[in-house]
Amino acid sequence: MTMSDVFTSVVLVTFPSEIQYDNWLAKFKTFYNKKAIEFLRDNGQISQRASRVQGDDVIRITIIWTYRNYDSYEKCQKFHGQWGKVGGEFIAKASGCRGYEVWTDLNFISPE
């Protein structure tokens, strides 16, 4: 795996209220349980994280998925695509972008 192979997907989700955010977070944690994460790892997902954006007047979450390569991304999308069926109803606006990694601090950190 070279750094140019690593593929990343980033989504910014905006919620109109704490209630909608809490609803989403509970379902997100249920959907991405240990078994789901094991499946995704087995199919090439390196990591997944969700962070709440600070210092904003609105409620926003940034979700970052990292994959070994584009093929891994495509394999994992079969699972991620089920979110709409399982996630249920909540009000939010999402926008995202995807692409190949061009730089990482891991180039400067030696493995222990």
Question: What are these model-derived regions, one by one?
Answer:
Residues V6-F15, T62-I64:
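Active-site-flanking beta-strand signature of metal-NTP-handling nucleotidyl enzymes
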Residues T2-F7, Q54-V58:
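Short, flexible turn/loop "capping" segments at secondary-structure junctions
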